[in-house]
Amino acid sequence: SAFRELVNPLLIIEQIYQRTGMKIEILSSAEQHFLGYKSIAAIEKGFKKMIQKGTAILDVGGGSLQVSLFDKDALVTTQGLKMGSLRIRQRLQELEKTTIHYDKLVEEFIRNDLMSFQRLYLKDKEIRNVILMGDFITDMIFQEEMEDRIITREEFMKRYEDTVGKSVDLLAQEMEIDPEYASLVVPTMVVCRNFIDIFNAESLWAPGVSLLDGIAYDFAEKKKFLKSVHNFENDILVTSKNIAKRYSSSKSHIQGTMNLCLNIFDSMKKVHGMGARERLLLQIAALLHDCGKYISMEKVSECSYQIIMSTDIIGLSFMERQMIACAVRFNNSAFVYYDELYSMGIAIDRESYIKVAKMTAILRLANAMDRSHYQKVKGIKAVLKDRELPDDRGFCTGHFPGTGTAER
């Protein structure tokens, strides 16, 4: 998160490369937390069992905090909040000297964001378990806990009361860490305690994994060294469906449009040449193509684009999110040539631009087939015939009755 917030990241990355020869790639917030999530999933037995009931993953970083909610083995939502332990310490550094109740000060500082999160995303959800991960400070806090690293709410509260009243120097001495890191202990504990309170959670699990575990797991999965029992792509789709639901998109229409998109995509693989990842991006674009209507019926394209670009979708890179947003934008507005994108504030490479063009064409066709939102077209089979794409009902993408002719 520190790299993401730099005003001159390219210069810093270049300096690192010049001095060390290492090439740095900055992960988006959604990518970082998705890999963290995978690191927990690597402990398959404990993770699978825990997420059967309402569970929250609390990823406490230095600059920000990510909360992911699970219910019945599915990821329901994930949200980022700017209340990392380092950020809190920096903001309250001067005030800390004026009070003997630093924990209460931290609690008041984060209360507004906590209440907003509870009002918007918890509602009637029951969260029984909290999985805690983040910076190594989390491991330091729970270094004396039992082997399975699961503690009850009562045990956590006992540790909390024993910790927050101590000075930074005393914490550094007891935990055998630098005072710089010891100063992050109280903010971390206060954040954890307040989330446990609003969740009304019964137990806390600190698996002791890191981002490196997630990167290793992701690499092994992509190279087919192992097969995960958990469906991560389904989590991305469920999250996208919940975003669409939040913006009151028609469930039947977006589901129908997505199915039509997949039918066309799968039937035309030899023509468009796109793979499984682009298929997933197309599904997400179909699910979110109507979300802008929640803000403006007149400026659907622009509003949909801004919503998607402003929403972290776990598991997607910034470039992938941009591709989805562009496909959704050009679904209703005029498609623009590559050289015009920069004037619109859109920065994608040429390869991604071609993929956006193909995704947009498929999305436009599928959306047109359900213009009435009655799902009259179902179960089509697309075939290529004489350089035209007719479906099994005799219609053709090159010519629709009453609409004129379009070139593919």
Predicted regions and their residues:
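Amphipathic alpha-helical domain-onset/packing element
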Residues: L365-A366, A406-R408
